[in-house]
């Protein structure tokens, strides 16, 4: 399915939102994250839309943390691992279709909606396993391969780090491409596209309905996919500055510098969202948009409805209006 061209109504100004909304696709659903709340909407096996929401931990999303460059980049890791895994576990529960009344209780103020606990020990265990897997595959493995090659080729800071970065990039692209061949993951990628398109519609002050959401592309410059690609690029530069010490020191440095790299990547992502028309930032975000061709699919109408339901729940919790803002006229 191909996205139609965007047609902007002339009588609606761009929404000057104070919040940069983000999100993540889950199993048959979408998680949306705002300034103080997160919301999840999932298409249940009976075709109803199930939604839930919870406040964000303000020690991470508010106060001084969000004002410190580099340090606030850690919230992106929390998004991808902490919040994302909670939302994923919630969506998996819904798909199991064996919920009891004690586990799922209808909400009084939402259409087919539930309030469920998003905090489970299993989620944290899964986060830990995911972190170990990610660090092992995408940081330690490329270094181990380069370290093995250095037994036959003299070590050189430039080529060693370039080779390590190239291997890391190949692993990343190969991973997202291969899992994208799985039917279930294809649907997750379609919900990923629906998430982006809904955010586009909100940011362009269009009504949140499938007719308007469908006009937008499934790629978005603030996507976490772009974040991952920036992590790879920044790691090449940063690790090159460290030279080629003993292999165990390099492995330790890769692990310890992950928060620093994430912080730098997050700042670039913020700049890309703040200055989308800047020629320099267009060059910076372009590779991430290209990579999203692998991690997004154009959704069908039912998938857009789920993304819209998630955004509407979030806007309600954030005290924002889901309706387009109307341009004021001088008297």
How would you label these PLM feature ranges?
Residues 1-109:
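Divalent-cation
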Residues 2-26, 30-32, 46, 58, ...:
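Polar-ligand-bearing catalytic/cofactor-coordination segments
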Residues 36-37, 68-90, 164-189, 261-274:
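Hydrophobic alpha-helical membrane-embedded segments
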Residues 63-74, 78, 257, 261, ...:
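Short, charged, low-complexity patches
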Residues 90-94, 130-155, 231-255, 259-262, ...:
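Juxtamembrane "helix exit" motif at the C-terminal ends of alpha-helical transmembrane segments
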Residues 98-182:
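Hydrophobic alpha-helical segments characteristic of transmembrane helices
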Residues 111-116, 146-163, 242-252, 271-282, ...:
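Membrane interface segments of multi-pass transport proteins and intramembrane proteases
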């Amino acid at each position: 399915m191909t996205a139609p061209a965007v047609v902007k109504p002339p009588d609606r100004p761009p929404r000057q939102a104070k919040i940069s909304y983000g999100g993540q696709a889950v199993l048959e659903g979408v998680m949306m994250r705002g300034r103080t709340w997160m919301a999840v909407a999932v298409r249940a096996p009976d075709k109803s839309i199930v939604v839930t929401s919870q406040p964000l931990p303000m020690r991470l999303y508010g106060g001084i943390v969000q004002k410190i460059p580099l340090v606030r980049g850690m919230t992106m890791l929390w998004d991808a691992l902490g919040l994302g895994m909670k939302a994923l576990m919630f969506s998996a529960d819904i798909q199991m279709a064996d919920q009891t009344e004690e586990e799922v209780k209808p909400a009084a103020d939402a259409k087919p909606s539930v309030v469920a606990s998003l905090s489970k020990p299993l989620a944290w265990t899964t986060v830990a396993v995911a972190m170990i897997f990610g660090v092992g595959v995408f940081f330690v493995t490329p270094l181990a391969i380069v370290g093995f090659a250095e037994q036959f080729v003299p070590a050189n800071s430039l080529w060693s780090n370039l080779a390590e970065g190239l291997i890391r990039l190949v692993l990343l692209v190969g991973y997202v491409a291969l899992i994208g061949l799985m039917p279930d993951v294809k649907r997750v990628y379609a919900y990923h596209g629906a998430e982006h398109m809904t955010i586009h519609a909100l940011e362009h002050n269009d009504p949140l309905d499938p007719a308007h959401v469908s006009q937008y592309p499934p790629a978005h410059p603030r996507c976490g996919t772009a974040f991952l690609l920036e992590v790879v690029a920044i790691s090449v530069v940063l690790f090159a500055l460290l030279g080629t010490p003993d292999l165990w020191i390099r492995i330790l440095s890769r692990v310890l510098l992950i928060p620093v790299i994430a912080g730098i990547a997050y700042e670039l992502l913020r700049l890309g969202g703040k200055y989308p028309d800047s020629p320099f930032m267009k060059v910076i975000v372009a590779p991430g948009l290209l990579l999203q061709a692998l991690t997004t699919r154009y959704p069908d109408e039912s998938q857009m409805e789920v993304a819209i339901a998630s955004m509407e729940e979030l806007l309600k919790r954030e005290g924002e209006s889901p309706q387009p803002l109307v341009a004021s006229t001088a008297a």
